[in-house]
């Protein structure tokens, strides 16, 4: 008995140890000669307090390649890249292909640049995603800015409420900043665009990279695996000296980057006959009445809450969607909001169909729920009889009319008496 209790106690301690040691491993790459790490201590300490295990690496301290993998296992969950002028060192330590592989394998990346520090490794990596930061030496200017010494941007230029939803008017200090042009991709998440009166100019040259609100100061990207990237065009944005104006936005931005918020999941996706009979009990056939329902929850950084939306759609597809129906709320509990299609009729076509909910909203994590089921055709004894088809009534009436007429003719022919007539005979004489 004592042995059993000891075994149970060891298992309990091991479980507590595993839960307690689940930290988010983060690699911090910086250039001490360009941007001293002490200037970002407020946000780095905040990450450590939120159970992030930070590993720091000065790119000038080594020229060897940084190991992001142990065989096929990721060694880090996140990477933070501060502005660096040692572009060649960064390229040797983390090549572009390695960054792409890390991002494809669900690793999150936060990178910053400045007009004087735009490493080619980061630039080429961002270009692969459709984000084009301004070249080195290009600075965004706004002569209508409240400050003549640094760029100040209003919260009115925020573009995505799932990243940061300002409850009141705020001003964000960027100092000297770069701006980026964006491709038209659904994975790109525009977060903060430049003021309409701004433009990007090169020092000593008259050419411009962006003009007005076509430039972006903060940009996100979320791949299909829900790994996230954020690029910030200014090295001053996260500095301690600007935390009074930028703190709330910066904290929420870091939470979004590292999947601490705006993460949704789909649960309890079910479909059945309209009377509640499941597919296993009675497989679907064409023109059956069916109901589909699914639930959605959203992680707010502390707990799962019901996700409220009015644009979630259900698709019944074979190759292309046969139906695309907007889901309606049907109920909720403390964690989940449930949605349903209501009753709908399956198409008059048999085959293999996918019951699909693919919800992709910019700023929220992507979630897909699909179930593949076969829809059979009607059996021989399940087709409607001819008299049930209204279009056949004309032909049935014609057939019945012919039969009745024939019977009437036969009866009349048989029962009607014939009149006898005597024939005269003559003998032929020569």
From Swiss-Prot:
Any Pfam family matching the protein: OST48_N
GO annotation, cellular component aspect: endoplasmic reticulum; endoplasmic reticulum membrane; nuclear envelope; oligosaccharyltransferase complex
InterPro entries to which the protein is assigned, alphabetical: DDOST_48_kDa_subunit, OST48_MD, OST48_N
Protein's UniProt keywords contain Oxidoreductase: no
Annotated localization: Endoplasmic reticulum membrane
Pathway assigned to this chain's UniProt record: Protein modification; protein glycosylation
Cytoplasmic side: 415-430
Transmembrane annotation, as ranges: 394-414
Superkingdom of origin organism: Eukaryota
GO molecular function (one): glycosyltransferase activity
Membrane topology: Single-pass type I membrane protein
Lumenal topological segments: 24-393
Residues bearing attached sugar chains per UniProt: 60, 332
Function: Subunit of the oligosaccharyl transferase (OST) complex that catalyzes the initial transfer of a defined glycan (Glc(3)Man(9)GlcNAc(2) in eukaryotes) from the lipid carrier dolichol-pyrophosphate to an asparagine residue within an Asn-X-Ser/Thr consensus motif in nascent polypeptide chains, the first step in protein N-glycosylation. N-glycosylation occurs cotranslationally and the complex associates with the Sec61 complex at the channel-forming translocon complex that mediates protein translocation across the endoplasmic reticulum (ER). All subunits are required for a maximal enzyme activity.
Quaternary data: Component of the oligosaccharyltransferase (OST) complex, which appears to exist in two assemblies comprising OST1, OST2, OST4, OST5, STT3, SWP1, WPB1, and either OST3 or OST6. OST assembly occurs through the formation of 3 subcomplexes. Subcomplex 1 contains OST1 and OST5, subcomplex 2 contains STT3, OST3, and OST4, and subcomplex 3 contains OST2, WBP1, and SWP1. Interacts with SEC61, SBH1 and SSS1.
Family: Belongs to the DDOST 48 kDa subunit family.
Additional notes on this entry: Present with 14900 molecules/cell in log phase SD medium.
Domain notes: The cytoplasmic C-terminal domain contains a functional dilysine-retrieval motif, which is involved in the retrograde Golgi-to-ER transport of the protein.
Protein name per UniProt: Dolichyl-diphosphooligosaccharide--protein glycosyltransferase subunit WBP1
The organism of origin for this protein: Saccharomyces cerevisiae (strain ATCC 204508 / S288c)
Lineage: Eukaryota, Fungi, Dikarya, Ascomycota, Saccharomycotina
């Amino acid at each position: 008995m004592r042995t059993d209790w000891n075994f149970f106690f060891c298992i309990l301690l091991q479980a507590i140890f595993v839960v307690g040691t689940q930290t988010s491993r983060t690699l911090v790459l910086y250039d001490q000669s360009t941007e001293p790490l002490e200037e970002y201590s407020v946000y780095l300490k905040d990450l450590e307090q939120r159970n992030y295990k930070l590993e720091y690496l000065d790119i000038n301290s080594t020229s060897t390649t940084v190991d992001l993998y142990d065989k096929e296992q990721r060694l880090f969950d996140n990477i933070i890249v501060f502005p660096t002028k040692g572009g060649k060192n960064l390229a040797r330590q983390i090549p572009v292909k390695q960054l792409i592989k890390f991002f494809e394998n669900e690793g999150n990346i936060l990178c910053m640049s400045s007009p004087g520090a735009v490493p080619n490794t980061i630039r080429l990596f961002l270009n692969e995603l459709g984000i084009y930061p301004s070249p080195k030496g290009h600075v965004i200017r706004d002569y209508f800015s409240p400050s003549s010494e640094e760029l100040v941007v209003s919260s009115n230029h925020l573009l995505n409420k799932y990243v940061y939803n300002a409850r009141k008017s705020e001003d964000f200090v960027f100092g000297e900043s770069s701006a980026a042009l964006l491709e038209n991709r659904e994975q790109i998440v525009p977060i903060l665009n430049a003021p309409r009166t701004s433009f990007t100019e090169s020092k000593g040259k008259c050419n411009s990279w962006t003009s007005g609100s076509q430039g972006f100061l903060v940009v996100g990207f979320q791949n299909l695996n829900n790994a996230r990237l954020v690029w910030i065009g200014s090295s001053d944005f996260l500095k301690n000296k600007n935390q009074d104006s930028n703190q709330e936005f910066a904290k929420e931005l870091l939470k979004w980057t590292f999947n601490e918020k705006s993460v949704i999941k789909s649960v309890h996706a079910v479909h059945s006959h309209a009377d509640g009979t499941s597919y296993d009990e009675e497989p679907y056939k064409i023109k059956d009445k069916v109901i589909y329902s699914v639930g959605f929850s959203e992680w707010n950084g502390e707990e799962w809450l019901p996700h409220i939306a009015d644009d979630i759609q259900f698709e019944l597809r074979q190759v292309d969607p046969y139906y695309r129906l907007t889901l309606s709320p049907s109920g909720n509990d403390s964690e989940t909001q449930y949605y349903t299609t209501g009753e709908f009729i399956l198409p008059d076509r048999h085959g293999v169909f996918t019951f699909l909910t693919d919800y992709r909203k910019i700023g929220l994590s992507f979630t897909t729920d699909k179930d593949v089921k076969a829809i059979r055709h009607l059996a021989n004894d399940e087709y409607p009889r001819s008299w049930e088809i209204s279009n056949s009534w004309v032909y049935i009436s014609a057939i019945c009319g012919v039969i009745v007429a024939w019977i009437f003719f036969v009866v009349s022919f048989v029962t009607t008496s014939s009149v006898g007539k005597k024939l005269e005979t003559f003998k032929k004489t020569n």
